[in-house]
From Swiss-Prot:
Protein name (Swiss-Prot/TrEMBL): Cytochrome b6-f complex iron-sulfur subunit 1, cyanelle
Recorded GO CC terms: cyanelle thylakoid membrane
Species classification: Eukaryota, Glaucocystophyceae, Cyanophoraceae, Cyanophora
Domain of life the protein comes from: Eukaryota
SUPFAM superfamilies the UniProt entry points to: ISP domain
Length: 239
């Protein structure tokens, strides 16, 4: 939960109050206030002064419920996860933003949308496989700009499908946990197996699939997956 306040300095013993959308502190004790979905708390900073009977101070607060991650949260998670896999880069703030904007055209001849790396460049299959070991699942920018996992098979070649990293519960980006051999959402605990099939809720559906191919110039490309989901033998819910 995000929770911010305006700093308040009050005499010792003061009573600081507010409405349901603000923070309340009584007698120096932390008091959680707000609606059932927007609750937060913080401790006041008191000045060394004589106790006051009662003094009211205005406290500016804002709370964002974790029940529904907004677009800002989703973009931030994309930024952090994609930045982490790319490693330190000078002026990193700019390059990583390329994952948060619509993809650019390009990537050679043939059908499909070119996968983009953390710098916004087309992903070349040769260089990708040089830096990603068998079993690796790392993010690239996929269809509609969504973070999408490219999978390296045990034989060192690229899997012919990619996994949309957006959790089907409330839209958080789901990281791959290699030690657990599954995708584990940090927001509400949903889990998916190595193929992206949901194995634990609250997520109701498996991660969306995308076709992965290599164009004539060696650029990796994504294409929409419209046929049966091989993991569930059902029509794709994302169609």
């Amino acid at each position: 939960m995000a929770f911010t306040t305006t700093a308040v300095v009050a005499p010792r013993g003061a009573k600081i109050t507010g409405q349901s959308s603000t923070c309340a502190i009584q007698n120096g004790k932390t008091v959680a206030v707000g609606t059932s979905k927007q609750v937060g708390s913080f401790k006041p900073v008191f000045a060394a002064a004589k106790p006051a009977k009662e003094t009211t101070f205005s406290v500016s607060c804002s709370a964002a419920s974790d029940d529904v991650p907004d677009m800002g949260k989703r973009k931030l998670m994309n930024l952090l996860l994609l930045g982490a896999i790319a490693g330190p880069v000078a002026g990193a703030g700019g390059p990583f933003v390329s994952f948060l904007v619509p993809p650019k055209a390009g990537g050679g001849a043939g059908a499909g949308q070119a996968a983009k790396d953390a710098l916004g460049n087309d992903v070349k299959v040769s260089s990708w496989l040089e830096t990603h070991k068998p079993g690796d699942r790392s993010l690239a920018q996929g269809l509609k700009g969504d973070a999408t996992y490219l999978i390296v098979k045990e034989d060192g070649t690229l899997e012919n499908y990619g996994l949309n990293a957006v959790c089907t519960h409330l839209g958080c980006v789901v990281p791959w946990n290699a030690s657990e051999n599954k995708f584990m959402c940090p927001c509400h605990g949903s889990q998916y197996d190595r193929t992206g099939k949901v194995v634990r809720g609250p997520a109701p559906l498996s991660l969306a699939l995308a076709h992965v191919s290599v164009l004539e110039d060696g650029v990796v490309a994504f294409e929409p997956w419209t046929e049966t989901d091989f993991r569930t033998n059902t029509a794709p819910w994302w169609k």
